[in-house]
């Protein structure tokens, strides 16, 4: 597994996802969804090429869907998780 790092924005995204999920569906569902997102991030670190390249967004960026969200990342010496955005969000506006 490659080491990985969450950007400050990715950490904030995950916190916001937790808060929304907890308020909307309760603690148990929020915890389940958080585990699903974490498992996706760990899978990306284990298999960095699994995500789809998103060169139109930014050079070197990749994307991988997880539930209703998309994990945006890039691969170098380590995997950098850049953002975790809802699939309905305009990624270009949030990553541009």
UniProtKB/Swiss-Prot annotation:
User: Do the record's keywords include Cell membrane?
Assistant: no
Q: What happens when the gene is disrupted?
A: No visible phenotype when deleted singly or as the parDE1 operon.
* UniProt GO BP: protein heterotetramerization
Keywords from the UniProt entry: Toxin-antitoxin system
Which domain of life, per UniProt?
A: Bacteria
Describe its assembly: Forms a ParD1(2)-ParE1(2) heterotetramer.
Q: What does this protein do?
A: Toxic component of a type II toxin-antitoxin (TA) system. Its toxic effect is neutralized by coexpression with cognate antitoxin ParD1 but no other ParD or RelB antitoxin. Low levels of wild-type toxin in the absence of antitoxin decreases the rate of cell growth, and results in death or loss of colony formation abilities and greatly elongated cells. Low levels of a mutant missing the last 4 residues leads to loss of cell division while cell elongation continues.
Q: Which family does it belong to?
A: Belongs to the RelE toxin family.
| Stated name of the protein | Toxin ParE1
- What organism is listed for this UniProt entry? Caulobacter vibrioides (strain ATCC 19089 / CIP 103742 / CB 15) (Caulobacter crescentus)
Gene giving rise to this polypeptide: parE1
């Amino acid at each position: 597994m490659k080491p990985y790092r969450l950007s400050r924005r990715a950490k904030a995204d995950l916190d916001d996802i937790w808060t929304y999920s907890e308020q909307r569906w309760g603690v148990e569902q929020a915890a389940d969804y958080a585990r699903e997102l974490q498992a996706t991030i760990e899978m990306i670190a284990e298999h960095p090429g699994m995500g789809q390249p998103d060169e139109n967004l930014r050079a070197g960026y990749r994307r991988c869907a997880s539930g209703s969200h998309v994990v945006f990342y890039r691969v170098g010496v380590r995997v950098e998780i850049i953002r975790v955005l809802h699939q309905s969000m305009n990624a270009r506006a949030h990553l541009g």
